[in-house]
UniProtKB/Swiss-Prot annotation:
Name of the protein: Tol-Pal system protein TolB
Purpose of the protein: Part of the Tol-Pal system, which plays a role in outer membrane invagination during cell division and is important for maintaining outer membrane integrity.
Domain of life: Bacteria
SUPFAM superfamilies per record: TolB, N-terminal domain, Tricorn protease N-terminal domain
Gene Ontology cellular component list: periplasmic space
The UniProt record lists the keyword Cell division: yes
Main subcellular location: periplasm
Alphabetized UniProt keyword annotations: Cell cycle, Cell division, Periplasm, Signal
UniProt key word Signal: yes
InterPro entries: 6-blade_b-propeller_TolB-like (IPR011042), PD40 (IPR011659), Tol-Pal_TolB (IPR014167), TolB_N (IPR007195)
Entry-linked Gene3D superfamilies: TolB, C-terminal domain, TolB, N-terminal domain
Signal peptide location: 1-21
Gene source species: Pseudomonas aeruginosa (strain ATCC 15692 / DSM 22644 / CIP 104116 / JCM 14847 / LMG 12228 / 1C / PRS 101 / PAO1)
Quaternary structure annotation from Swiss-Prot or TrEMBL: The Tol-Pal system is composed of five core proteins: the inner membrane proteins TolA, TolQ and TolR, the periplasmic protein TolB and the outer membrane protein Pal. They form a network linking the inner and outer membranes and the peptidoglycan layer.
Length: 432
């Protein structure tokens, strides 16, 4: 019983401030201010009003990165829709560095979107393109244009066309709560329900190709790990061991799954070959070992352990079993996520002498740590695959919500989501 209580207390502590999913991370503030840009309302050569405002979506994408500050429409002296209509003195007068124009033309039952991006200072066109899709794909086309523009101006691949997983919990009565696993655009738009249950769903994770997701479901009245195919909805139960089955994490090649089991007593980290279902135990310690996250080489595993008395982050060589402690700043560091360049570690952090749980990033070369969030009781950070943005769960007005933060700290906004408590965000990899 004492072991179960210890597990429960540690789990509650992690829920009060855990870190979830990540990828590449840029810890660079760059200029003192975001780059001013104007995304002019796109012209539309059609009779009906479009259901989505493309220029608004593109502007929000660029703003969310923390690199750009879109000019409010009311401050625009002119609103050209064609490249030939751009008057550079208008944009120099309002102080923007770049201006984007676009035009939407119906073509054979579809929409063709032509766009152009200009450097105001040099008065040169830096990007032009065309994309075609249906009315239902207006958001997809908007995210695509934002991706192309962001990469052209920064040299960093855009991540606005990615997706996000999250869990909602809507309580109707004391013993009646509905849990749903949702997949949406990265900004919370267009949510689609992948799974609905009367029992909790936790720890959703994308596979490296984004086609599968792993998660923990309590539908059998005990935690079990499932893998579900995003497109078809087909599910496979992966674990059915006694005790805790939790914290799944796909290996970089997608062929193995690390997770936590308490089948031998206390929680330990195991890895399963998904082809053969062969199981191997990785950790062997009297403490709680949990929340595995793979290094990109597939032979390094970061994890949380209280083997030093309080939750801290360690790394293990999967082949040799050698373990080293990674975090030393603060009295609580948990749920590690590694940047793609393996120079930065993202985690849930609590400073010595404080009670707040916040999201932080540690430079693994210099050792310094920086707090990224300005809220409390923060949980489950997940980083965009290009490292420019971070989404995490927190609580506002006694409700679970998701927050988007640019890594450079310039942008902090709540994301629109469904009713009820929203939790457990997980950012997708780049998708085809």
């Amino acid at each position: 019983m004492s072991t179960l209580i210890r597990i429960a207390l540690f789990a509650l502590a992690l829920m009060a401030g855990a870190a979830q999913a990540a990828d590449p991370l840029v810890i660079s503030s760059g200029n003192d201010r975001a780059i001013p840009i104007a995304v002019v309302p796109f012209g539309f050569q059609g009779g009906n009003v479009l259901p989505e405002d493309m220029s608004n979506i593109i502007g929000n994408d660029l703003r969310n990165s923390g690199y750009f500050e879109p000019l409010p429409r009311q401050n625009m002296i002119s609103q050209p829709a064609q490249a030939s209509e751009v008057i550079f003195r208008d944009w120099k007068a309002v102080g923007v560095n770049y201006v984007m124009v676009g035009n939407i033309v119906p073509a054979g039952g579809r929409l063709q979107v032509q766009y152009a991006l200009f450097d105001v200072g040099t008065e040169q066109q830096v990007l032009t393109g065309s994309v075609t899709g249906s009315t239902d794909q207006l958001r997809d086309m908007s995210h695509y244009i934002a991706d192309q523009s962001f990469e052209k101006l920064t040299g960093i691949k855009g991540a606005f066309s990615t997706k996000m997983l999250y869990v909602t919990a809507e309580r109707f009565s004391v013993d009646n709560t509905r849990y749903t696993l949702q997949r949406s655009d990265y900004d919370g738009a267009r949510p689609v329900t992948l799974l609905q249950s009367r029992e909790p769903i936790v720890s959703p994770r994308f596979s490296p190709d984004g086609r599968r997701i792993a998660y923990v479901s309590f539908e059998q009245k005990r935690p079990r790990i499932f893998i579900q195919y995003v497109d078809t909805g087909r599910r496979e139960q992966i674990t059915n061991f006694e005790g805790l089955n939790g914290a799944p994490a796909f290996s970089p090649d997608g062929n193995r799954l690390a997770f936590v089991l308490s089948r031998d007593g206390n929680p330990e980290i195991y890895v399963m070959d998904l082809g053969s279902r062969a199981l191997r135990r990785l950790t062997n310690n009297l403490a709680i070992d949990t929340e595995p996250f793979w290094g990109k080489d597939g032979s390094t595993l970061y994890f949380t352990s209280d083997r030093g008395g309080k939750p801290q982050i360690y790394k293990m060589n999967v082949n040799s079993g050698a373990v080293d402690r990674v975090t030393f700043i603060g009295n609580y560091n948990a749920n590690p996520k590694l940047s793609a360049d393996e120079k930065t570690l993202v985690m849930v952090h609590r400073q010595q002498g404080y009670t707040n749980f916040q999201i932080a990033a540690q430079d693994l070369q210099r050792g310094n740590l920086r707090v990224l969030s300005n809220t409390t009781l923060d949980d489950s950070p997940t980083v965009a695959p290009n490292g420019t943005m971070l989404i995490y769960a927190t609580r506002q007005q006694d409700r679970g919500v998701l927050m988007l933060v640019s890594i450079n700290g310039r942008v902090r906004i709540p994301l629109p989501t469904a009713q009820g408590d929203v939790r457990e965000p997980s950012w997708s990899p780049y998708l085809n």
